[in-house]
């Protein structure tokens, strides 16, 4: 892997990431079960100190008698799609984001004893928003469709907007809503982008 990214408070802001990997699995009897190959590249292109573009292209393939099923869908992998709603032994995913600051600070205050206990959860600093387009899909190898789905690549996409709200203890609330193509909404609590 190669990583030249420079990070800011919200995550990667400039640079590139390239990752490739191969994994092989055996079953309980020591016989070959599957081999997975993945390839991913990301590019972060700053516009200003706090805004910029993020691009991602990822693909994967699993072969063998019991191949891995890759799963996508939800806030971090194929926004606008149902959570874990895209699956198969092969996948291609591309995404492009425009990330911009929305609010430097927004908060609320309570009175009484709860004021100090709730303070970390009522202050939000450096809220970001933006627009995205995600495209791709997953499909099964020929003759291997255990859960239904496609055994050929059928492209799909979602374009919409997102909101990232950093909270106490380094966690981020992430909301996204597809407006064109797949129109799902997602909510996620986690860290980073």
Which role does the model predict for each range below?
Residues 38, 70-78, 146-153, 190-193:
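Flexible, surface-exposed loop regions and adjacent strand-edge segments
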Residues 1-126, 139:
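C-terminal outer-membrane beta-barrel translocator/porin domains of Gram-negative envelope proteins
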Residues 81-87, 143-152, 177:
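Short, contiguous acidic/charged loop-to-helix segments that flank catalytic cores in large enzymes
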Residues 115-118, 156-162:
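Short glycine-rich, acidic/polar surface loops and turns
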Residues 119-153:
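C-terminal hydrophobic structural anchor segments
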Residues 175-182:
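A short, acidic, flexible beta-alpha connecting loop/helix-capping segment that sits on the rim
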Residues 94, 98, 161-163, 182-193:
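Outer-membrane beta-barrel "beta-signal"
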């Amino acid at each position: 892997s190669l990583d030249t990214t420079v990070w800011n408070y919200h995550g990667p802001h400039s640079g590139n990431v390239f990752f490739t990997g191969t994994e092989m699995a055996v079953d309980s009897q020591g016989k070959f079960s599957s081999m997975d190959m993945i390839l991913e590249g990301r590019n972060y292109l700053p516009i200003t100190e706090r805004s910029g573009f993020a691009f991602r292209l990822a693909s994967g393939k699993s072969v063998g008698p019991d191949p891995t099923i890759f799963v996508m869908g939800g806030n971090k992998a194929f926004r606008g799609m149902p959570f874990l709603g895209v699956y198969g032994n092969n996948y291609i995913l591309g995404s492009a984001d425009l990330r911009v600051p929305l609010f430097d600070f927004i908060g609320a205050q309570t009175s009484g004893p709860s004021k100090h206990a709730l303070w970390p959860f009522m202050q939000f600093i450096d809220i970001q928003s933006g627009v995205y387009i995600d495209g791709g899909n997953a499909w099964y190898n020929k003759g291997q469709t255990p859960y239904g789905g496609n055994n050929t690549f059928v492209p799909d996409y979602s374009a919409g907007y997102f909101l990232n709200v950093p909270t106490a203890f380094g966690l981020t609330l992430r909301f996204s809503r597809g407006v064109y193509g797949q129109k799902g909404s997602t909510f996620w609590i986690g860290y980073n982008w």
